[in-house]
Amino acid sequence: MAVVSVDDLTIAYGNHTVIDHLSFSINEGDFLVVVGENGVGKTTLVRSMLGFLKPKSGTISIPQSTRLGYVPQFRNIDEEYPLSIRDFVALNTKPRLLPWLTKSEQNRVEQMIRENNLTKIAERPLGLASGGEKQRAYLAQALLPNPNLLILDESTASLDNEMKYELLDLVTRFQQNGLSVMFITHDWDLAEQYGTRFLYLSPGSYSTGPINELPSPIKGDKK
């Protein structure tokens, strides 16, 4: 069953077409890697899927049963940011009038803290966390409301190799339990190692399929 279906999607900025007649779907349990050079529309596609950008034509069909989670590449959080990692994760609880968390919400926060390897640093101010720790906190926050589709927008770009693998190993653990993942990346090695399917965007065209069908010319274009 598809958690997202994109059909004949065209997105343009003025007279400049960024995405042209794109069609693909993400099914339950997919780990879709989206690859391509800068400027081919990867982030534009994400912004449109999140509802921030209206396409020129085509459709993005997201069933009511699909719940989106999103982890960006970067957030402007400096050393003075006051919240602990635990409190930051808890920010993604359902808005309501009560100023405190229910018992079930507290349990869910602790579950995400534990499952994202944050227990030992949960009281650390987020502003003092390392890049990898921050990304795990962003992941825990995104997963708190139990989404079934997680979008990672260049979420490993600023991390060293060890932290990249740690983050994606965590994501894969959730994916193997049914989470669908859409991972935008420039890292071809990560794409091939973690993806189950690929979407390759290039100027004016695209290709998609199982990760083992990633065309050889694209593999030779690694950076």
Kindly give the residue locations of the regions a language model identified:
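Helix N-cap at the start of a conserved alpha-helix in ABC-type nucleotide-binding domains
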Residues: 161-163
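Conserved ABC ATPase signature
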Residues: 125-129
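Catalytic Walker B motif of ABC-type/P-loop ATPase nucleotide-binding domains
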Residues: 150-153
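H-loop (His-switch) and adjacent beta-strand-loop-beta switch element
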Residues: 196-211
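H-loop/switch region of ABC-family ATPase nucleotide-binding domains
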Residues: 185-186
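Helix-to-loop junction immediately C-terminal to a conserved catalytic motif
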Residues: 50
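Conserved ABC ATPase "signature" region
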Residues: 103-121
